[in-house]
Swiss-Prot record:
EC number in record: 5.3.1.6
Pathway(s) this gene product operates in, as recorded in its UniProt entry: Carbohydrate degradation; pentose phosphate pathway; D-ribose 5-phosphate from D-ribulose 5-phosphate (non-oxidative stage): step 1/1
Name the record gives this protein: Ribose-5-phosphate isomerase A
Taxonomic lineage from the root: Bacteria, Pseudomonadati, Pseudomonadota, Alphaproteobacteria, Hyphomicrobiales
Catalytic-site annotation from UniProt: 105
Listed GO MF terms: ribose-5-phosphate isomerase activity
Subunit: Homodimer.
Record key words, sorted: Isomerase
Native source species: Rhizobium etli (strain ATCC 51251 / DSM 11541 / JCM 21823 / NBRC 15573 / CFN 42)
GO BP annotation list: pentose-phosphate shunt, non-oxidative branch
Catalyzed reactions per annotation: aldehydo-D-ribose 5-phosphate = D-ribulose 5-phosphate
């Protein structure tokens, strides 16, 4: 079973949690896109859902495949969000934001009664941090914000490169007009402390640590998909 087949298995298992009539947050990334494709097949057969996309990229795919969409302002309370992750630990703490949609992903997840994370087994880790932590920042005062992040990291015993994410034509810009600093801290022993410290920096719009948000993680491997509940 290759990586895409594992993503499809995880998406299939998540789809079993979606009931007709649900208000559904729809994530961003390659695994979430497999979920959208499967959801679209059910919608074509008469399955009723209303989706709130977490990125313009996801919105375009939903429109292309016929998944009905609303804005979060139109549906401010959601039943369920299904989204991918870059890393998942045993407590279902996550690193997200590799696709650049972390702010909207977190807003949509927070507006949902439940969040289900779907991923292949390569994303399951004992401790977060092998994947660089995306930190969404305001373009104004970028150097000052970067220095503040470095100071926070030093206080917590973390170090590593802080790289401003690039795209083909310069700095990567999120759907909200912000930039992303990818922080290669390595192992993050206290994700809660780092989350709190980053939240205190005025120039930090959001970060990719999702803590106490996921209710379930569906992890797919060669033997199929398994469901993990938070070990908190």
């Amino acid at each position: 079973m290759d990586a895409r087949e594992m993503k499809i298995k995880a998406a299939e298992a998540a789809l079993a949690h979606v009931e007709s009539g649900m208000r559904l947050g729809i994530g961003t990334g390659s695994t979430a896109e497999e979920f959208v494709r499967l959801l679209a097949e059910k919608v074509a057969g008469g399955f009723q859902v209303e989706g709130v996309p977490t990125s313009e990229r996801t919105a375009r795919l939903c429109v292309e495949l016929g998944v009905p969409l609303k804005s979060l302002d139109e549906l401010p309370a959601l039943d369920l969000t299904v989204d991918g992750a870059d890393e998942v630990d045993p407590a279902l703490r996550l690193i997200k934001g590799g696709g650049g949609a972390l702010l909207r992903e977190k807003i949509v997840a927070a507006a949902s009664q439940r969040m289900i994370v779907i991923a292949d087994e390569s994303k399951l880790v004992e401790t977060l941090g092998a994947f660089a932590l995306p930190i969404e920042v305001n373009p104004f005062g970028l150097v000052s914000t970067r220095i503040a992040i470095e100071k926070v990291a030093a206080r917590l015993g973390l170090s590593g490169e802080l790289n401003l994410r690039q795209s083909g034509d310069g700095e990567f810009t999120t759907d909200g007009g912000h930039h992303i600093i990818d922080a290669s801290f390595g192992r993050i022993p206290d994700a809660e402390a780092l989350s709190s410290e980053l939240n205190s920096i005025p120039g930090v719009v959001e970060h990719g640590l999702f803590i106490n948000m996921a209710a379930l993680a569906i992890i797919a491997g060669p033997a199929g998909a398994r469901t993990l509940q938070a070990n908190r």
